[in-house]
Amino acid sequence: KKYQIHLQNHYDATSRQVQKKEIKVLKKRKNLLIGEVFPYQICLESTMEYSRFMLWFEKEVQKIVKELWNQHFIIKLTLSQLHFRETILFLEHLKDFSKRITIEFIGEDTPEIKKHFSVQEQEAFFIGKLRMLKKWKFIISKHIEGCSVEQTLAFTPCLHEIKYTMSQQARMEENIIDLHMFIDFWEYWAIHKKLKFVVEVKEADFITKSLMHKKVHVQFENA
């Protein structure tokens, strides 16, 4: 096997309870794990390999959600993966478990074969696919880092959750007041649109405590 599944816990920073388990993929070489694999990278590099990978990934995910029947899971995709039939089939085959799966859409590169579409055409396509996934009862989450505010606002009616992942670099570079203003805007938008807003951090630090004091919903990852 080229790949191996790794489950990463996402905790609520206040209760310290596991909320969800993210289904990650690690790459193996000569039985050594050599780092995380991102499906969209495979998708960009080779459609044949992506097809094989998604068949393998589907079997592994099915096995996990059946075994851990009382858990909620996160699967991270990019919007551009929705252009590929393999992705849609993968999600369609998981419909029976959709209420226990959050699909998190993260930053991305648009495939070369789709770059001739206008921004408006791309947006309309993605909105159609997100509506379909919502109809299938998946929980739809959109990361707001690395994408335009306009895009997130346009997709809002199709979402259950908006999420901001705070990297170590961002913490060092951001002015703490600017950061709080940024968080305040998205928290207001989420309340106004009846969405959940989550700030994800790598570990508990002073910024996490500051956000928790404001009663922002904070999650942190742990291996």
Predicted regions, residues:
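Bacterial c-di-GMP phosphodiesterase EAL domain
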Residues: 1-97, 188
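Short, conserved loop/turn and helix-capping segments at secondary-structure boundaries
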Residues: 44, 176-180
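Conserved acetyl-CoA-binding loop-helix of GNAT-fold acetyltransferases
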Residues: 56, 179-183
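The catalytic core of metal-dependent phosphodiesterases that act on cyclic dinucleotides
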Residues: 95-174, 184-223
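Acidic-and-aromatic substrate-binding clefts and catalytic sites of carbohydrate-active enzymes
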Residues: 51-55, 78-86, 110-113, 170-175, ...
